[in-house]
Swiss-Prot record:
Natural source organism: Myxococcus xanthus
GO molecular function ontology, one term from the record: ATP binding
Record text on activity regulation: May be regulated by calcium or a calmodulin-like protein.
Gene: pkn1
Protein name: Serine/threonine-protein kinase Pkn1
Family per record: Belongs to the protein kinase superfamily. Ser/Thr protein kinase family.
Catalytic activity: L-seryl-[protein] + ATP = O-phospho-L-seryl-[protein] + ADP + H(+); L-threonyl-[protein] + ATP = O-phospho-L-threonyl-[protein] + ADP + H(+)
EC number: 2.7.11.1
Signal peptide bounds: none
CDD domains: STKc_PknB_like (cd14014)
Entries under Pfam families matching the protein: PilZ, Pkinase
Record key words, sorted: ATP-binding, Kinase, Nucleotide-binding, Phosphoprotein, Serine/threonine-protein kinase, TPR repeat, Transferase
Length: 693
């Protein structure tokens, strides 16, 4: 979803093109059936985006990053802790189509099923009206489409496509076909090392190939025609070989600088892919070797059975063809030249403002076509890569509180930079996007910093990548002292030691921290010392008291482990305040815990019927079995109430509300019956701390 440029553009895709040109909107009426696209191209009025500043869950939309056929993507910032995500919002005019709203569910489900590091992560979603959205990881980089239009180096192309193949192989192994692969949906991000790291995006029209799912409506074409396999545009069944065909088109485009078919218009593109053989890549760009040409043309075979049997086979063929390409090129190049030209690609530079910008977060800087992707004919011999600074190879011992309330554990840190480091040597891996207090044990003394987990490498992935099991963190609140110490280490300079006064634990502080540790082991109510039926005013009061308590602790002389514990407690209090501090978030939090008394307090504090109904649908979608059992209790309670057995009826209502606490009618009936009984209630069970409202 590239950024919409100023001026007129297509209302569906946000791009400028003629009225008859093919529009990359994901849903089109089948021109073979005489249909028209919906919506048809219309001018885009450039104005202040009405969604900027709007809150989606815990995130506020800061600015729009890109716009595409199904929706727009915004930079989102957490309202309390400032963490950044990408928020994908469905276009308002498309919310009337249930099949498109369903694709938001499908995208989140598909990505969750696959769980591969080369696929963009989706953290949360809300498919309820009026604004369905997805919460995704924020990527710093640019789409592959930023570099199409000129032939690129074979080594760089194969490196990128191999990572795409890895992602698709994981998807196909779970029966998921992407169905809309194109350079816009392949994102290159910055990672440590030289090679661009690939993220595959937009599984919104992915389909479970072997599931009993409703087929696409008759007369509707789903995908992008320039990259669509013949069987897909003809409405036949598709499998992973349709994705393989799209990768063949992308490989053709990257190596030659143009698409295999340049026909204008949706119908012309579809017919070309269905009937016409593509021109040999070497006829477009002679530098394409015969080996690579053979692989591409086989991937572009009209019949699926004539292509490679799997993405893995295609990946292997690319690697073999690249090796042959290097050998052939070496015979045509003076000794030593190619060894430099064909080295592993480096991290991509950002495109200029005139080029397509990354939709999931791009730090766009003035630059040029990256040396990693430029064709060998466009580059000169490059000097050898500079040696890695000695400090970056030195492991830094750290202490980390991995779970709230626990003591810090010692880990090893590597890959140190001003932005963060990679931690390994432990058995527990924290969740992605969680915040952890970290103490760097430097020669100058311990330095404490709050970090956010941005990458998790479990054992299986660690074996594949030849790296230790661990997790990467970025510094969230790095001080000037920390930055200076890291800079000194990276430059190989000794860090000037600061005299340290040995600290002993204050018994009073130790007792307070132990009390806090016990509180933090519970739920949000326990962290803030609240009863489950506390009103919103009490929640805010206890939140302020918790912050003051932690601030007073920080005034003491704390040992590094104690300071790490306080940092972890601050994270825990912040999480509890976010869960209980607003009526909508608290009502959903209470629903998951069966706390109907808390839901009642949210209604008293102004939770609207529309908000409650939206939460109810989300709750039942995730716990569809809950309502059946709850309804049985509600019916039993109704029968007992009619029979005059009010105490027993109240008990049945209570049991039902613990399973389905967002049923407003039953909440009202329960509270009315309590009043009839004069405030008497059934005794709470041992695990229910809730008091009678």
């Amino acid at each position: 979803m590239p950024e919409v440029s100023s001026g007129g553009g297509c209302g569906a895709c946000g791009r400028r093109h003629g009225a008859d040109a093919s529009c990359p909107t994901l849903v089109r009426a089948d021109v073979r059936a005489g249909g028209t696209a919906h919506p048809r191209c219309a001018p885009v009025v450039e104005a202040q985006d009405p969604l900027v500043g709007v809150r989606c869950g815990s995130f506020r939309l800061v600015r729009r990053l890109g716009r595409g056929g199904m929706g727009a993507v915004y930079l989102g910032e957490h309202v309390s802790i400032g963490s950044r995500v990408a928020v994908k919002v469905l276009h308002a005019h498309l919310t009337m189509y249930p099949e498109l709203v369903q694709r938001f569910h499908a995208e989140a489900r598909a990505v969750n099923l696959i769980g591969h590091e080369n696929i963009v992560s989706i953290f949360d979603m809300d498919a309820t009206p009026p604004r369905p959205y997805l919460i995704m990881e924020f990527l710093d980089g640019a789409p592959l489409s930023a570099w199409v239009g000129t032939p690129l180096a074979a080594g760089a192309v194969v490196s990128v496509l191999s990572q795409v193949c890895d992602a698709l192989q994981a998807a196909h192994a779970r029966g998921i076909v992407h169905r809309d692969l194109k350079p816009d949906n392949i994102f290159l991000v910055r990672r440590n090392g030289n090679a661009p790291f690939v993220k595959v995006l937009d599984f919104g029209i992915a389909k479970l190939a072997d599931a009993h799912m409703p087929q696409t409506h008759a007369g509707i074409i789903v995908g992008t025609p320039e990259y669509m396999a013949p069987e897909q545009s003809l409405g036949r069944g598709v499998d992973g070989r349709a994705d393989l065909y799209a990768l063949g088109v992308i490989a053709y485009q990257l190596l030659t600088g143009r698409l295999p078919f340049n026909d204008e218009g949706l119908a012309a593109q579809l017919v070309a892919h269905q009937l016409r053989p593509p021109p040999p890549p070497s006829s477009v760009y002679p530098a394409v070797s015969a080996a690579l040409e053979h692989v591409i043309l086989r991937a572009l075979a009209k019949k699926p059975e004539d292509r490679y049997a799997s993405i893995a086979a295609f990946r292997n063929a690319l690697q073999v063809a690249l090796a042959e390409h290097v050998r052939v090129s070496a015979r045509k190049t003076r000794p030593g030249g190619l060894a430099v030209l064909e080295r592993a690609p480096v991290a991509p530079d950002m495109p200029t403002e005139g080029q397509s910008r990354g939709r999931l977060g791009v730090d766009a800087r003035a630059g040029h076509v990256p040396s990693s992707l430029a064709s060998t004919s466009q580059r000169r011999l490059a000097p050898a890569a500079p040696a890695v600074p000695r400090a970056s190879l030195v492991e830094v011992p750290v202490q980390v509180v991995l779970r709230p309330g626990e003591s810090p554990v010692r880990l090893r840190g590597s890959g140190l930079s001003r932005g963060g480091l990679f931690l390994h040597g432990g058995r527990v891996l924290p969740p992605l996007c969680s915040r952890l207090p970290v103490v760097l044990e430097l020669a100058s003394g311990p330095l404490s910093v709050m970090c956010e987990v941005v990458r998790v490498v479990p054992p299986a992935q660690a074996r594949v990548w030849g790296m230790p099991t661990g997790f990467g963190v970025q510094f969230v609140e790095a001080t000037a002292v920390l930055k200076a110490a890291v800079d000194a280490l990276l430059q190989g300079e000794p860090v000037r030691a600061v005299p340290q006064v040995p600290l002993t634990e204050d018994p009073a502080v130790a007792r307070l921290l132990e009390a806090w540790r016990q509180r933090s082991a519970g739920d949000a109510y326990a962290v803030l010392a609240l009863e489950p039926d506390s009103d919103m005013g009490t929640v805010r009061l206890r939140t302020r008291e918790a912050w003051r308590s932690l601030e007073s602790l920080e005034q003491h002389s704390l040992t590094p482990p104690q300071r790490a514990q306080v940092d972890a407690l601050r994270v825990r209090v912040r999480e509890a305040a976010e869960a209980l501090g607003a009526t909508v978030q608290r009502a959903l939090y209470d629903a998951w815990r069966g706390n109907h008394r808390g839901v009642a307090k949210c209604l008293e504090a102004g939770l609207t019927a529309e908000q409650l109904e939206s939460l109810r649908r989300e709750f039942l979608a995730r716990r569809p079995q809950a309502m059946g059992t709850a309804r049985s209790h509600f019916q039993s309670g109704g029968a007992l109430e009619r029979d005059g057995q009010l105490s027993q009826a109240l008990d049945q209502y209570e049991r039902g509300l613990k399973l389905a606490p967002l049923e407003v009618d039953m909440l009202q009936r329960y509270r009315r019956l309590r009043r009839v009984l004069g405030g008497r209630a059934t005794a709470p069970t041992g695990h229910d701390r809730a008091r009678s409202p």
